[in-house]
Amino acid sequence: MPTLDAIQINDTVIKQDGSEFSLWYNDTRYMCENINTMESLKELQSQIDIAKGHVVCTGLGFLLREEKLLEKEEVECVVVIEKNKDVIDMQRKLNPEIMDKLFIINDDANLYEGKCDTLLIDHFEDYEDNKLPIVTNCCKNIQHKQMLYWDIFADYKRYANYQELRKQFVTLPNFTPSQFYKYVERDES
């Protein structure tokens, strides 16, 4: 597992509260990860499971996804697009071994143009209400064969709704219902 620790570089801060880590820039929270919750583990696993070939990830975050991608045999290379240079510098300090294996591009993922087999989108602010315009833009600019974006299973908890979304984003995986619900956090009470 990557090293997670409270650290600050300029206006970018990683804060820790027990098993919860959050990434802040100019007092805006960009991500929060509780390393002990099933929801985040399922979401992470969905991206690992579909990844193959040349993988482009948007948003560097805490390297949880990237470390697992590097371990996967079907993944040839991992390119990460990260806009915030301070996040890149933090991870170089905390996790130099992982960072040395990644190809990091310091750029705005919303403007980046490229090509890959698997596109994994996760550069939203933490409380982003409407991710679809960002996803649409990245899918238009980065040619890819398949993609997922972070929190898709929180946004679309029903299989029928996910299938409707696939009409707009045809490169989303064509999960069977059982595959889909493997990643959805459901209240069983």
Locations of regions flagged by a protein language model:
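Conserved SAM-binding motif I beta-strand of class I
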Residues: 77-82
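S-adenosyl-L-methionine
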Residues: 84-118, 123-127
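Conserved SAM-binding loop of SAM-dependent methyltransferases across substrates and taxa
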Residues: 62-74
